[in-house]
Amino acid sequence: MKQGIHPNYHEVNVTCSCGNKFATKSAMEKENFNIEVCSLCHPFYTGTQKIVDTTGRVDKFNNKFGNLFKR
């Protein structure tokens, strides 16, 4: 490898908004890095995904405006 062309690869402390902290290696110049979502609080990994129920909205729309579009 050529000397002096590669970035400095060092340990970075990552802090999530949920309070989770972990260390990883990166070429970032910062020693500390803040993130908003990690695997402990992301809905995909926690299984707390919100499913939007649009069925009630469609029924409400059809009840309100259904007669306008019938021929």
Curated annotation (Swiss-Prot):
PANTHER family: 50S RIBOSOMAL PROTEIN L31, CHLOROPLASTIC (PTHR33280), LARGE RIBOSOMAL SUBUNIT PROTEIN BL31A (PTHR33280:SF6)
Gene Ontology process terms (BP): translation
Task of the protein: Binds the 23S rRNA.
Alphabetical list of InterPro entries matching this protein: Ribosomal_bL28/bL31-like_sf, Ribosomal_bL31, Ribosomal_bL31_A, Ribosomal_bL31_sf
UniProtKB keywords: Metal-binding, Ribonucleoprotein, Ribosomal protein, RNA-binding, rRNA-binding, Zinc
GO MF entries: metal ion binding; rRNA binding; structural constituent of ribosome
Subunit organization: Part of the 50S ribosomal subunit.
Protein name (database record): Large ribosomal subunit protein bL31
Record GO cellular component, one term: ribosome
Binding locations of Zn(2+): C16, C18, C38, C41
Protein family per UniProt: Belongs to the bacterial ribosomal protein bL31 family. Type A subfamily.
Cofactor, how bound (note): Binds 1 zinc ion per subunit.
Cofactors (names): Zn(2+)
Pfam families with a match to the protein in the record: Ribosomal_L31
NCBIfam families: L31, PRK00019.1, PRK00528.1
